[in-house]
Amino acid sequence: MNGYMAGVARAAAETFAFPEPILEIGSLQVDGAGGIGELRGMFPGKKYIGVDMRPGPGVDSVESVEALPRPDKSVGSVIALSVFEHVEHFWRGFEEVQRTLRPDGLLLVSVPFNFHIHNYPYDYWRFTPDAFRSLLREMPTKIIGQQGPKKRPLMVWALAAGPKYPTITEAQHVQFRTLIKQYAKQPMRWKRKITYGLGRLICGKGPFAPYFEAETFESHLERVA
């Protein structure tokens, strides 16, 4: 997870009610992340369970998202940021998330699109907004978002609500967007900014757009009639 998605998670936590228990999939705090991935503190006082395929800091239980050892409809909220690119059979993982999530539950999920290979321990997939629409088609209300240029986003995310979750309003969507602008940051280091700036002058802006537009985003509130 990058700092930008941590900001999106904070914006979501301050805008929407996350029912308990909250299950974070991929909660291992990776060395060198500087605490960016520590989401537990965004939900004070709530029952929060961190699971990962490996033990370590931030992990309460070692579990595979492809076969969660949890009863049907037993989880209030699921958070899975920058996880499913590492899941070999990702469709099984999405099925497990939706199996264990209660009808009044909430899911926050993100996956990179334009991002380097990062093996934790393996890196298999990239996703588009349409992929989330397909994978989450059973969840009637969704906010689909993406970071960076429309054609080559850095990250793609979705906030999806179960059929009995309180109606997500356009006013909440507007507040969510406002807080994303406030919290979600991905500044470019000055050396890289100079290097990419020269490259943009020589090659055109297209190849470098994801980096110069990293703090731009778009999102859409979608409902199934």
Q: Model features per residue range: what roles?
A:
Residues F16-H118, T128-D130:
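Conserved SAM-binding loop
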Residues M1-F16:
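Class I SAM-dependent methyltransferase Rossmann-like catalytic core
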Residues Y4-V8, E38, Q175:
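Exposed alpha-helical structural elements
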Residues E88-A225:
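S-adenosyl-L-methionine-dependent methyltransferase catalytic module, highlighting the catalytic core
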